[in-house]
Regions:
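Amphipathic alpha-helical blocks
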Residues: 55-77
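Conserved polymerase palm-domain catalytic core
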Residues: 71, 80, 124-130, 137-312, ...
């Protein structure tokens, strides 16, 4: 059914879908939504009703039947989310709302209906919280947009877009107006209105929701993308489509000078614009002067405030030259001179990201000496593996990877020495070895963890992590439309590059 919804949505961009609530309340649909919800790690965390995964599974069929009846009769009312606060990298706290499990099941069922429809509408350079897309897609796209265009190439200015408290300031009426462009089922619209108006329980007190979309629910990323799709549409209509790009003809100074003088005098030169968005973070690349970039920033601010009632944080929305570098989605992107003398964009690990991660690991290894040594090594390996996977396509990682390897290697050795109150040299003699033939030596421990598993574990070395060149396959297509596997030929590689650079 998701395949049909995606096909219908793709074939007719103006189609409004009706009778969708019947699909949300379908028995098979709810069973699948419950299976996905209860299989997630967050199912163990209860909402305001105190029901966790174990309690829900004990009476699942009766609960799903009750949910279905309430949905079809219009009596279903979402409970307020339980608000918790998690620390952010800058030391501040981020509020999250944890819905109860029955609301999470309903949200999952709604997501399974709505996402195939909107995936046909969302802009190709929108990557945040969408299926078959990731941070690496966005970074790769920005790097392609910053490629040196050759002779006469002007400097490029980058606008780092920052929306102030986006999730908490979404205008409910404007959001529902955007949803009605695709949904004509009034019962589903009423359910969605109840969802965004459910409020939360914060420190034992109820907080009503007058604006914003709930953070923490499975449907929240889709709702945020629906709202910001209006910004994508405005960018496409005014700066990115082929007609607008033909007016912005100043990409190459040598080409521009070849135009007849009469044509040059009658046509006003405008800077070319590139755009990439990941959730509420976006980047604009302006090929022109800094004044052109400031005009573009002001135009974005005006549209967001006047049409969407969103605030662009002008203090954090910086304008930076690409040669000075900027940070986007945890990567530092800068244009450097390559081995053949041409300027090329590279992505690197920001020093601040490295420092915070290293300090986090050092803090973990500076105490808790009673912890099982196998559990400690497993915990370290999971963190190191996740960090290496996130930066596996980043350029120039060898220095930071080797530096972090040395830090963790020596700090873990001192942790073992404090734990067993023995000399460092004896520990190195007993526990330093090569995990496999030809690999670098590291800490190799054998023993039993707290879960009862017995075996040998080696401390992960980042310098040996897999590195590669990131590629994607047809990210502009709706992933819910079933297709035969497309062979990745030379022609399809050129299509990938052309897609990423289509707005440059």
């Amino acid at each position: 059914m998701q395949n049909k919804l995606a096909i219908w949505s793709t074939e007719n961009k103006e189609r409004k879908f009706d009778r969708l609530l019947r699909l949300v309340a379908d028995r098979t649909w709810l069973i699948e939504a419950a299976r996905i919800t209860l299989a997630s790690s967050g199912a163990k965390t209860p909402g305001v009703d105190g029901v966790d995964k174990r309690k829900m599974e004990e009476n699942l069929h009766h609960e799903l039947a009750t949910i279905r009846t309430e949905l079809l009769t219009g009596l279903y009312n979402p409970l307020p989310a339980r608000r918790v606060y998690i620390p952010k990298a800058n030391g501040k706290m981020r509020p999250l709302g944890i819905p109860c499990l029955r609301d999470r099941i309903v949200q999952r069922a709604m997501l399974m209906v709505m996402e195939p429809i909107w995936e046909s509408d969302f802009h190709p350079v929108s990557y945040g919280f969408r299926p078959a897309r990731s941070v690496h897609h966005a970074i790769r796209t920005v790097k392609l947009q910053l490629q040196d265009s050759g002779r006469g190439s002007k400097g490029r200015w980058v606008i780092e877009g920052d929306l102030a408290s986006y999730f908490d300031t979404v205008h409910h009426r404007l959001f529902m107006k955007a949803v009605r462009k695709r949904i004509a089922d009034q019962r589903l619209l009423d359910l969605l209105w109840k969802l965004i108006k459910a409020g939360c329980i914060d420190r034992g007190l109820f907080r009503a929701s007058s604006e914003g979309v709930p953070q923490g629910g499975v449907i929240s990323p889709l709702l945020s993308n629906i709202m910001l799709h209006e910004f994508d549409t405005w960018m496409e209509a005014n700066y990115l489509n082929e007609k607008k790009r033909s007016v912005r003809w100043g990409w190459n100074e040598s080409v521009r000078q070849q135009w007849p003088i009469a044509v040059r005098e009658q046509r006003q030169w405008k800077p070319a614009i590139s755009y990439c968005r990941y959730a509420d973070d976006f980047v604009l690349v302006v090929k022109g002067t800094k004044a052109d970039a400031e005009v573009m920033r002001e135009a974005c601010r005006g549209f967001l405030e006047d049409q969407l009632k969103l605030t662009l944080n002008m203090d954090k929305t910086r304008i930076t030259h690409v040669n000075d570098g900027f940070v986007f989605l945890g990567h530092r992107i800068i244009r450097k001179r390559g081995p053949r003398g041409r300027m090329r964009p590279v992505s690197m690990i920001p020093w601040e990201k490295y420092r915070r991660f290293a300090e986090k690991l050092v803090k973990q290894l500076s105490g808790d000496y009673s912890k099982n040594r196998m559990d400690m090594m497993e915990h370290l390996n999971r963190q190191l593996g996740g960090w290496a996977a996130f930066y596996q396509y980043t350029d120039h990682t060898a220095t930071m990877f080797s530096k972090l390897d040395r830090t963790v290697f020596w700090k873990f050795g001192y942790w073992l020495a404090r734990k067993y109150r023995c000399g460092f040299r004896s520990l190195m003699r007993d526990y330093i070895d090569a995990p496999e033939a030809g690999q670098a030596k590291t800490w190799v421990l054998e023993g039993q963890n707290s879960r009862g598993w017995y075996g040998a574990i080696a401390l992960r070395r980042l310098i040996t992590s897999r590195k590669g060149h990131f590629t994607w396959r047809t990210p502009s297509e709706n992933p819910y439309i079933l297709r035969e596997e497309i062979r990745h030929t030379i022609e399809s590689r050129y299509a990938d590059v052309a897609f990423a650079m289509s707005n440059t």
